[in-house]
């Protein structure tokens, strides 16, 4: 392949009709100047945080709602506005945003807070290695260096608590009694409405929190959000009239998920751009839906526990051998062989039956209970994804990669 050929490819895409004016507007991380259909939640948060402007410590806040209901973007919007107006009144406010899906241990959260002040304090905590008590002592030292309000936003806090326990919340909710100058308050963001059930009584008693709930968007509200973003994201005239309503309708089926709606619109635009199309059409939206679902499914399979991955591969092998639908017993016998080949202790058939139900709920397989007359009822198990997809994922997974070398007929001969 010569340089001229590569150059011509880049030239072709460079001079194709541009679809996007500013694609970043469609990213989840973008904070718009206006948030349609979230005025009540903005008012609620502003009312809870306004004591800062009077020099008083605000209550802790827990923000609840399903994925894509505007929780994170609204919290960022309100805290950014609070920082702006606090400067007008000469009230020092620091907002520390922490994504607990990534920063997911007690130690790492404390380290992230300390390191927020590293330019001011000259103190930087490594990602691992210090005793947690020492990190907490440094946290108090850097926060309390001057009079100020520190608002700590813990996004996806439920994931942090489920993984690492609630000690971090206990520490942060009691920290004000150990500070002389600064004041700390917490905003927790959770997809799990039952989040507080995971908390110890001692944490609950020290929280003194308020709650703000974000309901799902309906199709009309999603359409308004997309129309607002589309004006900034796309050049005029490149979107067919049906594109935004279709993206909104598809996302409304996914419990009113604005993130899904934005992803659909962005990916549809990317597909149109790649094709060299002059317009984004409904066809591009349907292709985007297909791609997003495939990407989502791949991510689900990648994050399955080991035994679920082995079980799924047993079903893949049966599918490739033309033996689906299969019943639980047939799948279990292959699963046991695969466990043996990996030198892993197999689970009981009853537990594997539960895992089959979980894979069914995730949409990876279909496990339908059917009646066999006098032989009773049994599950008929089918694969909902391609064997190629599963194998491609397992190729990059050291735990289950050895399964790719096995053949069903040979495994049966060995057993």
UniProtKB/Swiss-Prot annotation:
**Pfam families documented for this protein:** AAA_16, Cdc6_C, Cdc6_lid
A molecular function GO annotation: ATP hydrolysis activity
Q: For this UniProt record, give its keywords in alphabetical order, as a comma-separated list.
A: ATP-binding, DNA replication, Nucleotide-binding
- Its domain of life reads Archaea
Q: Which residues bind ATP?
A: 69-73, 217, 229
Say if the entry is tagged with keyword Transferase: no
Name a single GO biological process: DNA replication
Sequence similarity: Belongs to the CDC6/cdc18 family.
Give the protein's biological function: Involved in regulation of DNA replication.
Q: What is this protein called?
A: ORC1-type DNA replication protein
């Amino acid at each position: 392949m010569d340089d001229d050929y590569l150059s011509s490819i880049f030239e072709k895409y460079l001079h194709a009709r541009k679809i996007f004016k500013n694609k970043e507007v469609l990213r989840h991380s973008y904070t718009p100047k206006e948030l349609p259909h979230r005025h009540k939640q903005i008012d609620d948060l502003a009312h809870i945080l306004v004591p800062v402007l009077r020099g008083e410590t605000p209550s802790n806040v827990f923000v609840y709602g399903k994925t894509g209901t505007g929780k994170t973007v609204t919290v960022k919007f309100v805290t950014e506005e609070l920082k702006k107006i606090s400067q007008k009144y000469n009230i020092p406010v620091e907002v520390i945003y922490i994504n607990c899906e990534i920063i997911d241990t007690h130690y790492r959260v404390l380290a992230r807070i300390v390191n927020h002040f590293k330019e001011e304090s000259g103190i930087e905590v490594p990602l691992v290695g210090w005793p947690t008590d020492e990190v907490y002592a440094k946290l108090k030292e850097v926060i309390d260096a001057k009079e100020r309000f520190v608002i700590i936003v813990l996004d996806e806090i439920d994931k942090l608590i489920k993984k690492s326990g609630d000690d971090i919340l206990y520490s942060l909710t009691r920290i004000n009694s150990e500070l002389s100058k600064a004041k700390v308050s917490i905003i927790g963001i959770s997809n799990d409405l039952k989040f507080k059930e995971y908390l110890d009584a001692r944490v609950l008693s020290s929280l003194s929190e308020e709650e703000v709930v974000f309901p799902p968007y309906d199709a009309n509200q999603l359409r308004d959000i997309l129309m607002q973003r589309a004006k900034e994201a796309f050049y005029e005239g490149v979107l067919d009239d049906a594109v935004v309503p279709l993206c909104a309708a598809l996302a409304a089926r996914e419990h009113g998920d604005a993130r899904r709606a934005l992803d659909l619109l962005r990916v549809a635009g990317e597909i149109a751009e790649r094709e060299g199309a002059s317009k984004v059409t409904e066809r591009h939206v349907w292709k985007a839906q297909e791609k997003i679902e495939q990407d989502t499914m791949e991510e689900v399979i990648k994050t399955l526990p080991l035994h679920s991955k082995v079980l799924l591969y047993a079903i893949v092998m049966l599918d490739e051998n033309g033996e689906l639908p299969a019943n639980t017993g047939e799948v279990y016998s292959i699963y046991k062989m695969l466990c043996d080949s990996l030198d892993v202790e197999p689970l009981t058939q009853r537990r594997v039956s539960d895992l089959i139900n979980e894979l069914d709920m995730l949409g990876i397989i279909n496990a339908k209970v059917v009646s066999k007359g006098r032989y009773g009822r049994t599950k008929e198990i089918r694969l909902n994804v391609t064997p190629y997809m599963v194998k491609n994922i397992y190729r990059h997974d050291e735990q289950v990669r050895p399964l790719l070398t096995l053949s069903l007929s040979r495994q049966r001969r060995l057993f």
